Structures are given as C-alpha cells and as structure tokens.
UniProtKB/Swiss-Prot annotation:
Keywords: ATP-binding, Cytoplasm, Kinase, Magnesium, Metal-binding, Nucleotide metabolism, Nucleotide-binding, Phosphoprotein, Transferase. The active site is at H115 (pros-phosphohistidine intermediate). Its cofactor is Mg(2+). PANTHER family: NUCLEOSIDE DIPHOSPHATE KINASE, NUCLEOSIDE DIPHOSPHATE KINASE DDB_G0292928-RELATED. Major role in the synthesis of nucleoside triphosphates other than ATP. The ATP gamma phosphate is transferred to the NDP beta phosphate via a ping-pong mechanism, using a phosphorylated active-site intermediate. Pfam families: NDK. Belongs to the NDK family. One of its GO terms (biological process) is UTP biosynthetic process. GO terms for molecular function: ATP binding; metal ion binding; nucleoside diphosphate kinase activity. This is Nucleoside diphosphate kinase. The gene is ndk. NCBIfam families: PRK00668.1 (NF001908). Homotetramer. One of its GO terms (cellular component) is cytoplasm.
Length: 141
C-alpha cells in the first residue's frame, strides 16, 4: 500500500476548504494515515523546498508557505502518489482538469491549494520530513 504526502496550503486553509479537500481524497479511496495542522517556520519551509533553492520562485514559495497554517497529511492507498497527483490536477489551476482540487480551489500557479509528492521516492522523503513513523497509522481500507 503506497503512501504519499499532501499539504493543504495556506490559501485553502484560510478559505476553509480543508473539509472539502479531505472529502475528495476519501471519496477517491485514499485514506488519511497521519494529519496535523502546522504553521511552518522559514527554516521548515526552506528545508522542505530545498530542491527549489536555486529556482527564481523559491523565496516567493517560502513566503507563501509561511503566510498561514497548513494541513499536512499522509495519504495511503493503492497507487497513492499517482491518484493524489490526478486529484490535485495540473500545477497551474487554469490548466487543471475540471473538478480537480486545483481547478476548484487554486488561484494561480503559485497559489494553487495543495502540494503532493511527485514520486514514491520523494513521498518517502517528504513524509519523513513531517512525521515520525510512530505518528503514521496504517489504515485498513
């Protein structure tokens, strides 16, 4: 059973879309194995997005991710990484499939509602960034 990391970003938390987004995951068969709400520090956001450190949007991304609380989740299920990516939709909400999370709740390529791991390898790294193994409950689906 695969696991992937999902983050409901500050824009969606601030607009009270948490429940709607979680419902989309659960209706698709993904289960929540761990979840917490946190307000990331600059250090935490920079550490999480370190792979983008040399990209021109890095500081804007960090500033956005520390602008308010986020909900961090471990989603679990068959093909969890790919299913989460499909449910999220394209990074740019204008290009995201109708009914996808980003099409429904995203505003722009930078303010796009959610983050999701892009591979199994990155999912393992990202999950361990936010959660200890003892915090993850292997749900039975």
């Amino acid at each position: 059973m695969e696991q992937t990391l999902s983050i409901i970003k500050p824009d969606s938390v601030g607009k009270a879309h948490i429940g709607e987004i979680i419902a989309i995951f659960e209706k698709s068969g993904l289960r929540i194995a761990a979840m917490k709400m946190v307000h990331l520090s600059v250090k935490e956001a920079e550490g999480f997005y370190v792979v983008h450190k040399e990209r021109p949007f890095f500081q804007e991304l960090v500033d956005f991710m520390i602008s308010g609380p986020v909900v961090v989740m471990v989603l679990q299920g068959e093909n969890a990484v790919a299913r989460n990516r499909e449910l999220m939709g394209a990074t740019n909400p204008k290009e995201a499939a109708e009914g996808s999370i980003r099409a429904l709740f995203g505003e722009s390529i930078g303010v796009n509602a959610v983050h999701g791991s892009d591979s199994l390898e990155n999912a393992a790294i990202e999950v361990s960034y936010f959660f200890a193994k003892t915090e993850i409950v292997n749900s039975v689906a």
